[in-house]
């Protein structure tokens, strides 16, 4: 996984991660989960099994790729995910899953949502940042058609857009290892080379 120094400020601080993990622990304790019990199957709702990923907007454009960039806030850094704007501002879950956490990151993502997924038996997480509104809560079961929030410009943001992170593993899960990966490794998007924005008109069309 990338270090916070390399990622700059567009990531959760250690204090924010600890706060989120405490909230998550409290949630599962109140849901009746016992020590060493699998959190994907305890509580009020089980984590559903999915088969694929979908784009999180019904239409939009790519405005920033994953990887090294020059950030207006922090200089050269690794951009931890992909940025999307234009089009429809409703944000959908990228796959079936369970809402792990919703919160606010003052120095980075602003209003954000973390969802855990089980895709073909493998663990993944998705994070949606800079939201204007959040429509789900911790523990909610979602699918690809669930509108989870609205695109916004909260946190460290220069304009209305969605920031999407994908992790291998369950992010914010105590005792679990989760590493950032390029969302393009799992979700098909049109190519963006830093010039004209790369647009897409739906959630399914395949781009080479």
Question: What role is predicted for each listed range?
Answer:
Residues 137-140, 165-208:
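Acidic, glycine-rich catalytic/binding loops that coordinate metals and/or anionic ligands
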Residues 34-36, 84, 112-115, 143-157:
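Short hydrophobic beta/alpha edge segments that flank linear recognition/processing sites
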Residues 1-47:
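Alpha-helical oligomerization segments with coiled-coil/rod-like character
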Residues 68-71, 98-104, 118, 147-153:
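Short beta-turn/strand-loop junction motif enriched in small, turn-promoting residues
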Residues 41-46, 61-95, 116-117:
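Short glycine/threonine/proline-enriched tight-turn/helix- or strand-capping micro-motif at secondary-structure
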Residues 62, 91, 97-99, 139-151:
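A structural signal for short beta-strand/turn segments enriched in small hydrophobics and glycine
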Residues 76-79, 88, 93-138, 157-168:
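Zn2+-dependent peptidoglycan hydrolase active-site motif and core
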């Amino acid at each position: 996984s990338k270090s916070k120094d390399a990622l700059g400020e567009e990531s959760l601080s250690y204090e924010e991660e600890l706060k989120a993990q405490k909230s998550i622990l409290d949630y599962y304790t109140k849901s009746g989960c016992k020590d060493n019990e699998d959190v994907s199957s305890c509580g009020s709702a089980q984590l559903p099994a999915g088969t694929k990923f979908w784009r999180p907007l019904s239409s939009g454009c790519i405005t920033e790729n994953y990887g090294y960039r020059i950030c207006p806030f922090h200089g050269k850094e690794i951009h931890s995910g992909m940025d999307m704007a234009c089009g429809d501002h409703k944000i959908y879950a990228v796959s079936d899953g369970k809402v792990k956490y919703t919160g606010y990151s003052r120095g980075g993502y602003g209003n954000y949502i973390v969802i855990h997924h089980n895709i073909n038996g493998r663990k993944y997480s998705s994070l949606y940042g800079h939201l204007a509104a959040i429509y789900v809560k911790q523990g909610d079961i979602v699918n690809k058609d669930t509108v989870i929030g609205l695109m916004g410009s909260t946190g460290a943001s220069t304009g209305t857009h969605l920031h999407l992170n994908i992790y291998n593993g369950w992010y914010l899960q105590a005792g679990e290892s989760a590493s950032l990966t390029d969302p393009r490794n799992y979700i098909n998007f049109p190519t963006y080379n830093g010039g004209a924005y790369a647009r897409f008109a739906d959630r399914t069309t395949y781009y080479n």
